[in-house]
Regions:
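Bacterial N-terminal signal peptides
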Residues: 5-15
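Predominantly soluble domains enriched in secretory-pathway, periplasmic, or organellar proteins
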Residues: 15-325
Length: 325
């Protein structure tokens, strides 16, 4: 996902002066893997408007929209959606659990809870957010979020919306995921993944991965990180706490996202909106090149892909993706 959802030209100009240009994105060079994005046909298109970004999947799929200070709930059986106002500038991921959609808001340092069934705001409570480009998680009876750049992982009780534990992980940690019986946190600054015990809140392992890991997902037999330093993906074996594969995806630089599900691992980045990795071989088997992309989620029989710059969200049948050549 992109660093900020603010789209005013003056702000973008200031960002261009403050940050170096994105490194070239070569993609993969394996013959037969690269496919023009225009060949990929979505099963449904949701015209969200604004800048649809972070997503979460429950019975329906949710997407945040920072410029509009809202989230949208998309019906997976049609192209309809409803919008829900939340806090200022929703950012840094979405998570669905305990009857709620959990929405971090960078503009006012709050968390908004939205009812998954009725789409109504249940609560809004103050909590700092480490970075606008990160990720949150639900699992082990809690909501998890990084709250500062020093590496503070907060565990929130969904019954009280109160922080009940703070776990100290490496600095520059911004994204967290839950799965395989543990909490997993990427440190972009230290290029490691921290494994946290869900019962004791203690750090169990620190696992070196590729350079500058940011986004993380659990599924398809592994823990996977998208490494912004060189555009690679690291696969961690949760049984050994070691990297079992490093996959060159060719998408270095900021933004992007990764999701495991529907038999594949999916990566999105500007210029290469969708890349599919086969977890049985740890190889990139398809890479779609062209415009679009920014956030990806897989689940309940679909792959969901945001097109940040055009305000669209695509719903895709993974079988249709695999058949596209």
């Amino acid at each position: 996902m992109r660093k900020s959802t603010i789209v005013f030209a003056a702000v973008l100009a200031l960002q261009a002066q403050a940050h170096p240009s994105r490194p070239p994105r070569p993609g993969v060079s394996t013959p037969g893997v690269r496919i023009p994005m225009k060949k990929l046909t979505p099963d449904a298109v949701y015209t969200i408007g604004g800048a649809p970004d972070w997503m979460a999947i429950d019975d329906e799929t949710w997407v945040s929209n920072g410029p509009k200070n809202m989230v949208a709930r998309m019906d997976p059986k049609s192209t309809t959606f409803v919008t829900v106002p939340v806090g200022k500038e929703p950012c840094s991921g979405l998570a669905a659990g305990f009857g709620s959609l959990w929405v971090p808001n960078c503009g006012d340092s709050t968390i908004t809870r939205v009812g998954l069934k009725d789409g109504k705001v249940q609560a809004t409570f103050p909590l700092t957010i480490a970075d606008s480009e990160g990720g949150v998680a639900v699992g082990a009876g809690s909501f998890w979020i990084l709250t500062d750049t020093h590496g503070t992982l907060a565990r929130v009780d969904p019954d009280t919306n109160k922080v009940v534990a703070e776990i100290y992980v490496p600095p520059g940690s911004f994204a967290v995921a839950f799965g395989e019986g543990a909490i997993w946190v990427t440190s972009t600054e230290r290029s490691v993944v921290t494994r946290v015990n869900q019962y004791t809140n203690l750090v169990e392992a620190s696992i070196p991965v590729g350079p500058k890991p940011r986004f993380i997902t659990v599924g398809e037999g592994g823990v996977w990180t998208l490494n912004q330093g060189d555009g690679s993906v690291s696969r961690i074996d949760p049984k050994t706490n070691k990297v079992s594969a490093t996959i060159d995806v060719g998408v270095p630089g900021g933004g992007g996202e990764i999701s495991a599900g529907e038999g594949s691992v999916w990566v999105t980045a500007m210029e290469y909106p969708l890349t599919r990795i086969d977890p049985s071989t740890n190889r990139v088997v398809q890479q779609f090149a062209g415009d679009g992309g920014d956030s990806v989620r897989a689940g309940h029989g679909w792959v969901w892909l945001t097109h940040l710059r055009t305000g669209l969200v695509w719903r895709l049948d993974p079988r249709r993706i695999e058949a596209t050549r």
